Curated annotation (Swiss-Prot):
Family (UniProt): Belongs to the bacterial solute-binding protein 2 family.
Taxonomy, superkingdom: Bacteria
General function of this protein: Mediates chemotaxis towards D-galactose, L-arabinose and D-fucose but not towards D-fructose. Probably part of a binding-protein high affinity uptake system.
Keywords: Chemotaxis, Periplasm, Signal
Induction: Induced by D-galactose, L-arabinose and D-fucose. Not induced by stress conditions such as nitrogen limitation, osmotic stress, salt stress or temperature stress.
Other notes: SbpA from A.brasilense cannot complement an Agrobacterium chvE mutant with regard to vir gene expression.
Residues making up the signal peptide according to the UniProt record: 1-20
GO biological process, one term: chemotaxis
GO CC, alphabetical: outer membrane-bounded periplasmic space
Cellular compartments annotated: Periplasm
Pfam families cross-referenced by the UniProt entry: Peripla_BP_4
Full protein name: Multiple sugar-binding periplasmic protein SbpA
């Protein structure tokens, strides 16, 4: 993919954006503080998200309060309460557990604070104004489609053995990723061209709490020892790069990745540097890139619209949080593998080539 990717995507986003500001938009010199609550620094992705938002908000004259909760729910609740108490006018929240924020968001509502759910839907609260994210079902479709294409299933090849991994059960996105992938894979499972060797299907059986790579590695260890003593696994659906790295460590531990035992097709998401290096080394096969610069930009546009009395959405039907359908803006994800990583990630300026040396 050429360096025009970012320009094209930005142009599409601007063209699709429904932006209706009021007659008295907030003046630049009066722009308030935006509280940004991120889940953890353990993933490079969230560090990049936070930094991108701070940079773009401050460029527009906003003050920012960026906090990381290190995947500790009480810590995130306390951070959000403090942001409200310190008069943040808008909260941008990537929730650790999207079901735990009802009370603190009521506090925000009572003080007139607007709330934007960032990439992870906040559930069970009426007090979520907007949701900025990617097309999460499509992320799963890309992952499932990559497996289908890599194995040659459309050409009638098979049967093959596959194992399924899901994301964290407390993250609404995990279900969209899984359902998107299964919308592609299930017909091949039903026809017998794909066999789930362990028989473990469904988010209640395949989820990975907190998206933890070590947890995924331990589960993969168990699957290999219990179900693959005399057969090989040909593909592993992984929803996230950190999980993929754990899966690959397990596979390498029993000899996969050698000439006599090729690595299965392993998917991923977020285009994190370790996984791109793994792709270049011939281990992980693909990932899904979500340009967080664009997500940050759309979030800033949302805040501008919220404070100006307008809206900034392109989806008003998909994301029901149990209390309301949250108006959302969905960005387009991109599949990345060894054939297009440089054009997509380096030529667009997202990474430098030196990061992969």
């Amino acid at each position: 993919m050429s360096s025009s990717f970012t320009t094209t995507l930005a142009g599409m986003a601007v063209g699709m954006l429904v932006l209706a500001t009021g007659t008295n938009p907030t003046l630049a010199q009066d722009k308030p503080t935006v509280g940004i609550a991120m889940p953890t620094k353990s993933s490079a992705r969230w560090i990049d998200d936070g930094n991108n938002m701070v940079k773009q908000f401050q460029a527009k004259g906003y003050k920012t309060d960026l906090q990381y909760a290190e995947d500790d729910i009480p810590n995130q609740l306390a951070q959000i309460e403090t942001m409200v108490a310190k008069n943040s006018k808008v909260l941008v929240i990537a929730a650790i557990d999207g079901t735990t924020l009802t009370d603190v968001l009521q506090q925000a509502k009572d003080r007139g604070v607007k709330v934007i759910a960032y990439d992870r839907l906040i559930r069970g609260s009426e007090n979520v104004d907007y949701y900025a994210t990617f097309d999460n079902f499509q992320v799963g479709v890309l992952q499932g489609s990559y497996i289908v294409d890599a194995l040659g299933l459309k050409d009638g090849k098979g049967p093959f053995n596959i194992e399924l991994f899901g994301g964290s059960p407390d993250d609404n996105n995990a279900y969209f990723f899984y359902n998107g992938a299964m919308s592609v894979l299930q017909p091949y499972i039903d026809s017998g061209k794909l066999t789930v060797g362990s028989g473990q299907v469904g988010m209640d059986k395949v989820s990975t709490l907190r998206w933890d790579g070590a947890t995924a590695q331990a589960r993969m260890d168990n699957l290999l020892s219990a179900f693959y003593g005399n057969r090989r696994v040909d593909a592993v659906l992984s929803p996230y790069d950190g999980i993929s790295i754990g899966i690959i460590s397990s596979l390498k531990g029993v000899g996969y990745g050698s000439p006599s035992q090729p690595m299965p097709v392993v998917t991923g998401q977020d285009a994190e540097v370790p996984s791109i290096k793994s792709i270049l080394a011939g281990e992980q096969r693909a990932t899904v890139f979500k340009d967080t610069r664009e997500l940050a930009r759309i979030t800033v546009e949302m805040v501008d619209a919220v404070l100006g009395g307008g809206t900034a959405v392109n989806d008003t039907k998909t994301y029901d949080n149990g209390k309301k359908v949250v108006p959302a803006y969905l960005l387009k994800p991109v599949s990345v593998d060894a054939s297009n990583w440089k054009g997509t990630l380096v030529d667009s300026g997202y990474y430098t080539e030196a990061q992969f040396k």
